[in-house]
Amino acid sequence: MGAQQLIYISKGRIRDMYEIDLFDGHCDTISRCFERGGGFRRSGGHLDLERTRKFRRYAQFFAIFGDSAATPGIPLWELTQREYAVFRREMAENADLIVHCRTGGEAEAAYAAGKTAAFLSVEGAELLDCDLHKLEEARAMGVRAVNLTWNHANALSGSNAEETHRGLTERGREFVRRMEALGMLVDVSHLSDRGFWDVAELCTGPFFASHSNSRAVFSAPRNLTDAQFTAIIEHHGVAGLNMFSDFLGEDPDVETVVAHLEHFLELGGGKNVARGGDWDGISKTPRGFGGIQDMDRLFERLLQRNYTEALVRDLFHNNLMRVVNEVCTM
């Protein structure tokens, strides 16, 4: 990058010079709409379609998420169906701006039509009753990634917050094998450490941590150890950096986010870091980041630090799309 380019960047001209592609691995926008009302086109949250339009290309994993404590009286599988109905409604009502995608090829078609590419995930297999038949139903609905646990332990494994000593049960192992056979991404964010290593042992292809940071940079059980991130590299997977302040550090800002990213890069993760903002599911974000509309600040900061544009585009979009192309083939 030439000196003149750096001068322009330092003046904040990045929006005029670069068109940004972004593929984010996790948001809770569906459950936000389910709980509070409203829709995808315009909201007061972290993410909406009016803001995704600012990017040249934008893809997002939208998570179906629910906690029985927050929705008493609604069985979790029924909650899954209700949130799926919200997702389908928003796809239909905003068909001019967004389309449900199942493969990377479908995302490319969405981009060509000037639309946001929406992928569907499930955060916590308890929403599928940890049941293989419901896993297959979810895949038929277009789900392409599943967190094995949320914060609660379930019939598949312990989590990072409950029964942390417990790894995958036999049913959990069957679930992982079936997900790989179905072309679905196994998501290890929220999983217990032992559960993580069981997944790493079982998976023959890429798996991912959709929204997890570095435990070496900030010690939180939800973050990844260096050994875990190295295992993700060895499986050609990705880790999506989370924008929740409590997983970044004390009074975080853009430099804190960069610190997590750079630590993963030092471990050899140039093709294995992605974005996973946890948008609309978090209460605190780093200073200067109110939602996806501010992600250009991170893009600009990385270029100011002499990251190549090719590397930044990998971190923001291409790495996660590569994994989707490899795993979600049908």
PLM segments and residue spans:
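N-terminal hydrophobic targeting/anchoring segments and the immediately downstream early-domain regions
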Residues: 2-165, 170, 202, 215, ...
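Catalytic beta/alpha-barrel core
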Residues: 98-99, 184-191
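Short, surface-exposed connector motifs at secondary-structure boundaries
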Residues: 116, 176-184, 305
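A generic "binding-loop/recognition-motif" signal
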Residues: 152, 191-192
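Alpha-helix-loop-beta-strand connector modules within alpha/beta enzyme cores
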Residues: 167-181, 199-207
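Short, well-ordered alpha-helical microsegments
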Residues: 193-197
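Catalytic glutamate of the conserved HExxH
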Residues: 212
